[in-house]
């Protein structure tokens, strides 16, 4: 049996979808009282399109950025190592300011590829995509979020998401 979300009129039922990639979004919606209708209005699409995101557990990352910006929040993604590999010395990574220098949404992806020596030619076949696909994502500054999670899993990385209110 599914329980209704605490926000009446949200049209989102907890447990309706088995979310992995968009769980952070439904958690945020529940915390802030956003409904699927208000999300649709903020990004300029239909409610059905938002339902489709949750049905497929996938959305273009540009839509995520657009939603959070429109709602007055900043969202930052990063890919980090969960734990050192065997034989690698343990090191404490200091929290660094990850402010985008280029303003690109996928700067975190380009940075992680470089930081962890992940080569497109090696990871692309494992992901079932062409070797130029990752280059395409970076040059067009957009990707479906499921690919970020898939790349992270194959590379032994963890997707981290930081959401903060804009202080303009």
Question: Where do the protein language model's features map onto the residues?
Answer:
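A short, Lys/Arg-rich alpha-helix, primarily the initiator
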Residues: 1-32, 87-117, 162
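Residues that mark the N-terminal boundary/hinge immediately upstream of a DNA-recognition element
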Residues: 24, 35, 60-63, 119, ...
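Residues within the helices of the helix-turn-helix
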Residues: 26, 37, 110, 121, ...
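The alpha-helix within a helix-turn-helix
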Residues: 29, 40, 68, 124, ...
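Short alpha-helical DNA-recognition segment
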Residues: 33-51, 117-135
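DNA major-groove recognition helix of helix-turn-helix
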Residues: 54-55, 71, 138-139
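DNA major-groove recognition helix of helix-turn-helix/homeodomain DNA-binding modules
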Residues: 62-78, 145-161
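Short amphipathic recognition helices of helix-turn-helix/homeodomain-type DNA-binding modules
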Residues: 78-88, 164-168
